[in-house]
Design a protein with these regions (language model features):
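Catalytic-core segments of class I nucleotidyltransferases/pyrophosphorylases
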Residues: 60-67, 75, 79, 108-207
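Conserved donor-nucleotide/metal-binding helix-loop-beta segment in metal-dependent transferases, i.e.
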Residues: 57-95
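Conserved N-terminal catalytic core of the sugar/cofactor nucleotidyltransferase
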Residues: 1-49, 55-56
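Short beta-strand segments
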Residues: 48-51, 87-90, 173
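Short coil/turn connectors at secondary-structure junctions
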Residues: 17-19, 42-45, 51, 79-84, ...
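Conserved catalytic core of nucleotide-sugar-dependent glycosyltransferases
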Residues: 96-110
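Residue-level signal for inorganic ion chemistry
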Residues: 38, 52, 102, 134, ...
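Short acidic/polar capping segments at secondary-structure boundaries
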Residues: 27-28, 41, 52-55, 60-61, ...
Length: 214
């Protein structure tokens, strides 16, 4: 950080005062296993943000850009209901086989199918990598152990809350753009979108894109 500040690069200033801890997951055992590694640093309910899923606002002009409020909305929902919740996004029938697909009733998730075929999908609403987990998460992850459930451990956690009628659905609307950077084209789109939001790049990039489209 210091070398950047000394050169007048202040774009990381919003991180001032935030303490960050890193844990390295040396074995690919899934999300539940990764969360368990941070057990000693977490107290109470907490947000889970999957870094390969980028949620931001849709925009038609640079001046209309606003930061995403998805995490804030999850916190507000939890404070109102005291129940865990997951953000979901309508991906259309052609993409359901890439994600966990849910059905909903009265604001709650009632079923969850992991990467179904289009014929078996209960809906077109996908889990999009943004959650608010409850304080009982670690006890439940020990109950649904990684040794028994492997990488699907975190799915069993969600299903437990779902069976209790406690898993809320936070439905994202068209004001939110979701980029799944695990897909090469989605990753490229996210980079272009980000650059178009940057005043130092936007005009030249738009001009270059127009030229390439001619």
């Amino acid at each position: 950080m210091y070398p950047m500040y000394s050169k007048g690069k202040n774009h990381l200033n919003p991180l001032d005062g935030v303490e960050v801890f890193f844990h390295t997951q040396y074995e690919q055992k899934g999300l539940g296993h990764a969360i368990m590694m941070a057990k000693d640093k977490i107290q109470g309910p907490f947000l889970v943000l999957l870094g390969d899923n980028i949620l931001t606002t849709n925009h038609s002009a640079l001046t209309e850009f606003k930061p995403s409020t998805v995490s804030k909305e999850l916190v507000e929902r939890y404070n109102a209901t005291q129940q865990p919740c997951a953000s979901v996004y309508d991906v259309g029938i052609d993409r359901v086989s890439n994600y966990g697909i849910v059905s909903m009733q009265d604001g709650s998730i009632t079923s969850l199918v992991e990467k179904p075929t289009s014929a078996d999908a209960p809906s077109t609403f996908a889990l999009c990598g943004r959650y608010l987990y409850a304080a009982d998460t670690f006890d439940l992850l020990e109950q649904y152990s990684v040794e028994e459930y492997g990488e699907l451990q975190s799915i069993e956690l969600l299903r437990h809350w779902m069976r209790q009628g406690e898993l809320g659905a936070h439905l994202l609307d068209a004001s939110v753009a979701w980029y799944d950077s695990g897909l090469p084209l989605e990753w490229l789109k996210s980079q272009i979108d980000h650059a178009l939001r940057r005043p130092e790049y936007a005009q030249q990039l738009r001009q270059w894109l127009d030229e390439r489209m001619d």
